[in-house]
Amino acid sequence: MIVTFVALALSCCTPQVTADCGLRPRLQSAIITGRIVGGEMAKLGEFPWQAAFLYKHVQVCGGTIIDTTWILSAAHCFDPHMYKLQSIKKEDALIRVADLDKTDDTDEGEMTFEVKDIIIHEQYNRQTFDNDIMLIEILGSITYGPTVQPACIPGANDAVADGTKCLISGWGDTQDHVHNRWPDKLQKAQVEVFARAQCLAAYPESTENMICAGLRTGGIDSCQGDSGGPLACPFTENTAQPTFFLQGIVSWGRGCALDGFPGVYTEVRKYSSWIANYTQHLLQDRNADVATFTITGDPCSSNGSIISGSEGDFSSPGFYSGSYTDNLDCKWIIQIPDIGSRIQLSFTEFGVEYHTFCWYDDVKVYSGAVGNIASADAADLLGSHCGMNIPSDLLSDGSSMTVIFHSDYMTHTLGFRAVFHAVSADVSQSGCGGIRELLTDHGEFSSKHYPNYYDADSICECFITAPTGKTIELNFLSFRLAGSDCADNVAIYDGLNSSYPRIIRLCINQGFNVTVPSSSNTMFVSFKTDGQVQDVGFEAYYYFSSNGNSTDDTDYSQCGFSSTPINADQTAARIVNGDIAIAGSWPWQISIRLCDTCNHYCGGSIISPSWIVTAAHCIESSAHITYIRAGDFDRFTIEISETIVPVAQIFIHPDYQKDLPNNADIALLKLANPLSYSSTIRPVCFPSQISTIPEENAECYVTGWGLTEENVMAQKLREAKLPLMPYDQCLNVYTSYVLNENMLCAGNISSGIDTCLGDSGGPFVCRKSRNDPWILYGVSAFGRECGSSRYPGVYTKVTRYIDWIIATANVSTVTSVVEEHDPTEFEQGCIQLLVLSNHEGDLSSPEYPELYGEGMLDCQWKIVLMDRTKSLNINFRFSHSQQDTAAACSLANIRISESYSDGTVGRQYGPYCGSSESILISSLHDLVVSLHNSQSQVKIGLKLEYRLEELEQSGCGQLKHLIENKGNFSSINYPNIYSANSHCEWYLHASIATHYLQISLSQFSLENAYQCRYDFLTVIDVTENGNISHGPYCGNSIPHVITGHGLFHIKFRSDASLNYKGFFASFVELNERPQEESGCGGVKFLNGTNGTFQTAGFPLAYEANLDCTWVIEVEDGYKVRLNFQQFSLESSSSCKYDWAMLYNGEFAFEAQRIDTLCGYDVKLEDIFESTSNVMRIDFHSDFSFNKQGFLAMYTAVSPGSSRSSVHQRENHLQEKRSGGCQDSIFTDEEGVIEYKQGDHTGNTRCLFRILTNHLHVIRLWLRKLSSLNLHENDSIKIYDKIDVDDIYSGVVKPVFQFTGIIGYLDSLPAYLDYNGGEISMLFSSDGQHGDTSFELIYKLMQDKSSTTNPKQLWNDHHGKWPWMVSLFGSSKYYFCSGVIISSRWIATAATCNLRSSEIHIIFPEGTNPKKIWEVEKIVVHPEFKMIYNVPQNDLALIQLVDPIEHIPPVCLPVASNIYSDCHVLKIPRLAGSAAFPDIVRISSVDTLAHDICMREWHLRITDDMLCGRINGTNSCQRDVGGPLVCQSPSDDAWYFVGISSWGPKICNDNTAHHRLPDVYVSVAYFLKWITKIIQ
């Protein structure tokens, strides 16, 4: 394929391109992702045709340069009616070009011209905007340059295609409905051209002279002030370099960036003749030189492309569609005709996945023609580039140059576009592969060959020149020089050459992350090396900055505002696949790092120059957090705006994790150095303590670099708009999590908006309107299932901790916002102080009894209680013009709160709305009554009456109503004998209705009687779903602790005789329900796929007077199946003494009762099943005849394997299973189902179930790898997606069955496939033969065509790998593997994060596989470290306390041996099996040569590593430490060749990542060290 590109085309079907229009010679921009409405700033020279139309020195419109004396714009820009003027004069108009920043008159190429003439189209219609076009002729002539160029004018037939992506630019309104909020800097955006039919659908009034452009979902558009500006579209049919044509002029539209309403543009091609008529020569050929070059071949084929010509351009695949793809290897060989010249290569746009050494994706540039990387001469490498910074220009040594582009298997970005041209051989060269003089406003350069080693005895010099008035800052992104005597060094001078003062000299690794500023506008950099050892060198980034005399007077310390607007509201914006934020739009966002070069770990928010607020859980497990990065946007790029600051101190809230998990999950970081505020580094505001949650109509966002999909962290800062979820709704969602009032929830459970790991500690901010500041309401704490559509994110509520923050961080350094409305918005004079000297009174809202409807209303009355011995009875009627909905209540309501003497707020009541209420308040404090209405269209009214009353008594010497956080109550006369005929009542009130109360009785002695019929105590838990009664209690047994909701009604009665000491009780208010261990007196919550619970004391007799509750919750979509392993309660015909009641759901509703059980009639075969995913079990015992109780087992079952009936009790198992064989459920992707007769006796029936996604096929192996030893009366029956009860009852037939198979495996099929996603296997045996056993292997397949090499499945011969070791934590969780290398030493990987006090070791295939071996000490290789998440020297040795006997060690490798038949070994994790598995998995491995491995992993491989490709799969993290063993043909012995260390980011994917091998530690490399340690 040969494609010839010509800058002038004369085809009737393609645009006529003149040689000097539509080009961007100074282009330095990245891909456009923003918008003008909330848009992204343009770069210098990115829109060289852009002009500004000023009237009386005020910019009112845009325009487009089309010639040296002509500007094209919209006619309505010079229409006096648009400005409500009688007339408008051209003498008051100006044209300005190359104006990037309106506040800076020194923009490169900026020129201002007076207007000579204005020509408005003769048929312009101001009502319809038809023919909205005008020509402006200027006085003088525009001088073209890098930042000033004309746009091309299309011909009459050159219509732009539907769907074409075009660019818009301007200084217009950046936020719709907030007019005159125009930016100072030129904005840009990318839009899509709509089809004519779509345009008419949005605007039926549009004419044929108009086109529409925008986004389908809105959010991107031009706006007021952009009028007259360009819609520039690229023409790329025959050229890789786009030439831009002016296809449209910004004209009109409905709103700005609204969904369904694109912008409307005057279609320029319809006026080409009209333009030519006035400009005459404009469309004629300008007789410019025509540049021609050819491209031969596909760059991504094996041979690559050849580019021939004196100048031209090319780009990476997919560049113009926005992104390259994975797994690319592309090559361009550039050849210029003049063999005496050099090639200068310039990147105009650049965006490649970043790594310090460009290990992932990169662009390599070589001098000369290179066939392939493997054969390339390292000396020819000019540089290897990645990241988002544009590299500086590169120079070849001769007339040819090679560019090689590689991408790995994941994370792709924009790509690049490059231009080249021939230059003279005497062009000044830096010695680093590029030009010597650097003039662009920012750029990147490196030592020659970087990241390969630089040359010996070399000199690299370059000088950087900034415009007058600017200075230069140089930052080293990477720096590593050889030698210890500074013979290799980088010297930096404050001037044009080395004769100027030297700023600094850097050597070894001194330059890493160092920023070097100049004091003038020039800087000279000199890199010199000696003839000894070399290293990788350096990579540097420079930029121009202000010299400190800036006139910017912005107060960046003002909290909650950003200098850059955020993206306009998006529907379903989310961090999980969410919106990329605009750089600088969230200036308080910071990134927490474990080290100055480490990856993002957690988020946080700036609250003052020296303080950061974040989540405590980010800090507790990472004591080495030492740095924060502020002003960051792209994690992979060192940006001008960002700064790294060390952390001096960490403060975790003292209540963190107190009482419940995730409580008080908040922490403060004090910085070692204060931050300097700027446009990208600013503080966020605090809410007032009164406003605990955002207002109903506030817009709220969460930001961060969290996971965009499972395990993929965002490269650029993302934002998501989240709705606040009501607390009670959040409680209903998180039924198995404990929440409290210190938390708030946000997210949309219907659309899956959420944050993920990595966003932890980040801000949840809200604002009331676009003119208001952003306020920090939440700190990202936790959630369930990243991006789940069912669970919102949970945030620490900041208002709960403001006092602590201010006290810790010093009130003078923290900015806070008290949310107050503009006083002019509300009714005045509605504040009143009421001193209650009379016993009763009233108050009312303005104009009562009429509803107040003249605007928003905020009223406040303070009621001062003069008589503290009385209670206040309040009755009020609150009228509301809207229905009583949660939304309406949040807008208009009444609240009552206690006011303490120190000015703080105590217990709060409300909000109340749309109802009549009667409240009895027993308070010793003053009260504040607040009436609030925040919407003018809502009418409200209030009438409140109050009356002082004597405090009501309980009858036992205390008040009847107890409203304290904690307290006591007791029987009358306690501790003396209580009175006869006592009648006492108490109401215990929680201060907040959603809190819980807990009662503990420390003394208890009442008359004992059957059913407590004489003296008794009853506790009633009053809930909105019904009352829950505890008791009655009597006798001398102290009842268990009782926990309930926010209101307890307590009754004590005594009869006329036999009075005792009585009782003493304490109560306390809790923020959340505690987890009861026994379930007695409260609720024990259980979850998971299976589990057990039992009555207290089981198998001994339970206690008297128990009330126990268990609530079981399993995953949504599953049901709870329950059976009792043992059951023994007191028996009665109606179960009226001791009983167990089973309910559907969390509450004990009679209509949801499944059954009531007692006595001995519950059998093992009885099955009880819920209709939903929640089941409740209540257990009660009376005062006598206590039995053994019960042991219950529950299992989560899918609806497809369960019955629909509520009560399963009649579905008995037909035969009792014996021998201790229990049902097992397998959910892993692969596993082994095994049985050994020696573990069981007698008749045995075992059920094994494999449950998986219905999209999977379950493959069951029956041959070769299977072990079947079944006798005549032994059988295995396989059922495909059949109800378990039907299997046991025998009402269905199996789909496959085999029996009596001993040594006849070849008669069976190789494997069986089942499509249902669920199979059950019923094994039956009479137990007569002691050698009955079997092993069956299964694996989940995507479809039936999937194939798997059997070598990667479980090994079928135990004992073959006796030296294989499993490493378990103290909780018996398997985390790593290892291998025995001597009688007391085990080798494994250092990345296992070993701690001797927490490791237990077993040998799965040893003589005693269950024995646990203790650890004496651990020796980690002294040079073990992580370099950019890649482990180096990943080896550790474990010494055992006792020597290993009867197990030979593995053979260590011999250097002279040649190995074949290599395998990696692994200990599997099997569901339903013992905690310590006794089986080893084996997978065959094809080892790779070291150079191939280096190329595959792109230089990440070091000499201590080996590579191998596992047949059919990859290792996962749980394989770490496992051995790579190979057999020697000479002696058939197995040799320990490698240790599983690391590999692809995503495992078990046989397609996308097949090119990348796994990486192992080379044991041979460390033989000397190993020998030294173990000897």
Curated annotation (Swiss-Prot):
Residues 36-280, 575-810, 1314-1575 form the Peptidase S1 domain. Residues 1-19 form the signal peptide. It is found in: Secreted. Keywords: Disulfide bond, Glycoprotein, Hydrolase, Protease, Repeat, Secreted, Serine protease, Signal. Its EC number is 3.4.21.-. Gene3D superfamilies: Spermadhesin, CUB domain, Trypsin-like serine proteases. Disulfide bonds join 61-77, 166-233, 199-212, 223-256, 300-330, 358-386, 432-460, 486-507, 602-618, 700-766, 730-745, 756-786, 830-859, 889-913, 956-984, 1012-1034, 1080-1108, 1135-1158, 1221-1246, 1376-1392, 1493-1507. The active site is at 76 (charge relay system), 132 (charge relay system), 227 (charge relay system), 617 (charge relay system), 665 (charge relay system), 760 (charge relay system). Residues 300-423, 432-545, 830-949, 956-1070, 1080-1197, 1221-1341 form the CUB domain. GO terms for molecular function: serine-type endopeptidase activity. CDD domains: CUB, Tryp_SPc. Expressed in the testis and ovary. Expressed in the gonads and gametes. Expressed in the follicle cells covering the vitelline coat of ovarian egg. One of its GO terms (cellular component) is extracellular region. Glycans are attached at residues 277, 303, 497, 513, 549, 748, 810, 968, 1027, 1087, 1090, 1273, 1511. May be responsible for elevation of the vitelline coat at the late developmental stage of oogenesis and during fertilization in ovarian eggs. This is Ovochymase. It comes from Halocynthia roretzi (Sea squirt).
